[in-house]
Amino acid sequence: MATVPTRSGSPRQLTTKQTGDAWEAQARRWLEGKGLRFIAANVNEPGGEIDLIMREGRTTVFIEVRYRRSALYGGAAASVTRSKQHKLLQTARLWLARHNGSFDTVDCRFDVVAFTGNEVEWIKDAFNDHS
């Protein structure tokens, strides 16, 4: 778990949520630097959450952000399991429906931004509804 200095100078532990939020914010800034445009963050639908939704040109990009301290056990990218992919697909399907769209009518893809230690890996089109 990450630490953050406090006013007293002694570090305090960040919660898992705070750590996740910090990495998601870093991913957003990094992707904006690559030309993507922010739409939404922490989108909740029954059964799941999407970390970031952004646009690249005409493509809606659903982004899962992962962080691991080290590559032990496969690193951050390996932690996006088939079960997690299914939840992301379902959540995106519901979000699109709420915005009058579907996988058939909206050009979209699923990316993973994986932070392992100090390394960042952007996996475009990491999976899809046909995987």
Curated annotation (Swiss-Prot):
InterPro entries, per database record: Restrct_endonuc-II-like, tRNA_endonuc-like_dom_sf, UPF0102_YraN-like
Top-level taxon in the UniProt lineage: Bacteria
Gene3D superfamilies in the record: 3.40.1350.10
CDD domains given in the database record: PoNe_Nuclease
Regions of compositional bias (Polar residues) in chain numbering: 1-19
GO terms of molecular function: nucleic acid binding
Disordered: region residues: 1-21
S-S bonds: none
Matches recorded under HAMAP family: UPF0102
Annotated NCBIfam families: PRK12497.1-3 (NF009150), YraN family protein (TIGR00252)
Protein name, as recorded: UPF0102 protein YraN
